[in-house]
Amino acid sequence: MPVKIPDNLPAAEILSAENIFVMSETRAAHQDIRPMKVLILNLMPNKIETETQLLRLLGNTPLQVDVDLLRIHDKESRHTSLDHMNTFYRDFEDVRHKNYDGLIITGAPLGQLDFEEVTYWDHIREIIDWSQSHVTSVLFLCWAAHAGLYHLYGLKRELLKTKRSGVFVHSRSCDHHPLLRGFDEEFFAPHSRYAEIPVAQIHAHPALQVLAESDEAGAYLVLSRNSRNLFVIGHPEYQKSTLSDEYHRDLAAGINPEIPQNYFRNDDPAQPPVARWHSHGSLLVSNWLNYYVYQLTPYDLSDMSAITPWEASSKS
């Protein structure tokens, strides 16, 4: 939680420079403690597994979070019963009139298709467009990150020769950024995808900022300059066994996949995997909720015009 201090206290500038989260009395007066309302658009086939992964991360923060689950259509999912979907998920028509503090859009196993070939691409575009006026901050994961960067900023991805699967080391691309508070200079994150957007294209876009990247895996954390959209080109939510499950699933399907890099002990699939990203994943989601949802969102969600970018709010 933030440290509330008097307006114009000299310590404010010093603490901000040291990456300490402070909030002026003036800004605090416009906020009150209430649950953060977060919508999750779950595009993964195994809905329950993905729900659990994301709720685990959201539950590691000191903030109270109310979650709504959103589906892209009312058809039965391959790995999740229609009863589960009808009981726990909402359709877009149920929420389009609402505003939310945060939206998380998950990845999807669609990495080798052009976006326009995805049967529900028009629905994805509609929800992304809606989010820009109805949600304080949107977190896009993996495939959704590529989809968002394409739809909002026109950045095109390129197919890789082989699937990029494994746990890769990343480094911060900038210092003293709120989203990176508490991050080590180098940290690990899982990747599982068939495409990438060249990092040079993202760096060159004036509306985007690359916060973390990998020599092997490319851009990882990309933030829009208005602080409203965070693109996480990876899977910080993955549990320890997820890459192993994907690898053995592909083996069983006769795909002959590459062994996930830096994942199994001694790179041997017969040995257990080593999870090196859980603390980073928790910190990433905690920082997003704290600094880009709680810090920016209006108390009255009906007035989304009260949102101000972090750079402006941190000077208040």
From Swiss-Prot:
Q: What is its main location?
A: cytoplasm
CDD domains referenced in this protein's UniProt entry, alphabetically? GATase1_HTS
What residues bind substrate, as annotated?
Answer: K163, S192, R249
Q: Where is this site: Important for acyl-CoA specificity?
A: G111
GO BP of this protein: L-methionine biosynthetic process from homoserine via O-succinyl-L-homoserine and cystathionine
Q: Which UniProt keywords apply?
A: Acyltransferase, Amino-acid biosynthesis, Cytoplasm, Methionine biosynthesis, Transferase
Q: Where is the active site?
A: C142, H235, E237
Reported function: Transfers a succinyl group from succinyl-CoA to L-homoserine, forming succinyl-L-homoserine.
Q: Which PANTHER family match?
A: HOMOSERINE O-SUCCINYLTRANSFERASE
Q: Which NCBIfam families match?
A: metA
Output this protein's name: Homoserine O-succinyltransferase
Organism the protein comes from: Shewanella amazonensis (strain ATCC BAA-1098 / SB2B)
Q: Which gene encodes it?
A: metAS
